[in-house]
């Protein structure tokens, strides 16, 4: 649990910052409160893409959560560095992360730095993990072999894994914990980049219920041979995070979804 009485605070591991673009170069976005390991940012008043960067892939590698596009490693994307209290950005035409007058939001997570080698699975991975908050960033190269495993670095099995092929146009796969009957361990998935209902298909079956992720069906979406992938893994932590499902009731007074705390970030 994250317990303020013991010196811990949720804001030490997750925080949201807002800013208004000014076209400047080398602009420091501060107030995060820590050096972020995963930054997800978006213009709030424009249709610019979502941008996702992390400390494992580096500050020059951008993925787009609203697109299936491969990772872009263009030298100058406008995201300059991860800093001790946030990050530094510049306005670059075509990237638009500090466009004059545009309002922006960035969600920031703290993991475990740039990552270390993890050999818990049959695939060696690079993992940046924060065991206290149940969050890790996992980089690995696929094998194409059913039953391959990869370590995630967490103290409990992930309840949620968001996986993206970095070097090809694969969808963002959102995979749930297998014991959740609403999100079964049978290849079921959601995708960030579409409005599609839950899917189920070849190349997507994964088991999360152990110290490693097991690629039951190691297809292109999650473990194609010689392809590079990034996975963001989560499990619930009392007082900090909660993952699950709920059923709507088509009523203005909708269902109450208990988390045990007031959330700072909700993804539905």
Where are these regions (language model features)?
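Surface-exposed molecular-recognition determinants
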Residues: 1-268
